[in-house]
Regions:
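N-terminal domain-onset segments
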Residues: 1-63, 102-164
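Amphipathic, interaction-prone secondary-structure segments
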Residues: 38-94
């Protein structure tokens, strides 16, 4: 976890809850990328933009009925357009193929509740709670791709040590 994102969670979680309560589910609940962008927009990028949700790189690692999604999310940088590995955060989530085995699909489709699709509907109180829990999981799964200290270590290797 990234400490500044955890701090942002405690600062903005009520805003996220209000967002879920006042926006229809198709605005954030149809896929994990939209959910991640909502977490970035409402939690992390408030009060200032830290991550650039418009440049997220998404990868589905398996393309089968279940597996892992990973995302590379660049930090905002006013000095250059191309991020380096130090400027990126990665996030991951496991997914399933149906509302019984996939968290987001289960919330959206109302699995175990009313079994009504989320399209055009404001979420129920229990769905808001579940979206909040999933948002927290996404935030907890965000990690720096490489820290500045790790990057510096790469440059501190002495040529002579490897060429003996």
């Amino acid at each position: 976890m990234i400490k500044e994102y955890v701090d942002a969670w405690f600062r903005n979680r009520d805003k996220l809850k209000k967002y879920f309560e006042t926006h229809t589910q198709e605005q954030y609940g149809q896929n994990y990328t939209d959910m991640l962008k909502t977490v970035i927009k409402v939690i992390i990028n408030d009060p200032e933009e830290i991550l650039d949700e418009t440049k997220i790189i998404e990868r589905n690692l398996t393309n089968y009925y279940q597996g892992d999604y990973i995302w590379l999310i660049p930090r905002k940088n006013e000095y250059y357009d191309e991020p380096t590995v130090v400027d990126c955060v990665f996030c991951y989530v496991k997914y399933g193929s149906c509302c019984g085995c996939d968290t987001l699909m289960g919330i959206y489709e109302g699995f175990g509740e009313d079994n009504q699709w989320g399209e055009g509907l404001l979420p129920s109180e229990s769905r808001v709670r579940d979206y909040m829990y999933l948002s927290l999981q996404l935030l907890q799964n965000m990690k720096p791709l490489m820290t500045l200290e790790e990057a510096r270590q790469n440059y501190e290797i002495k040529y002579e040590d490897y060429m003996k």
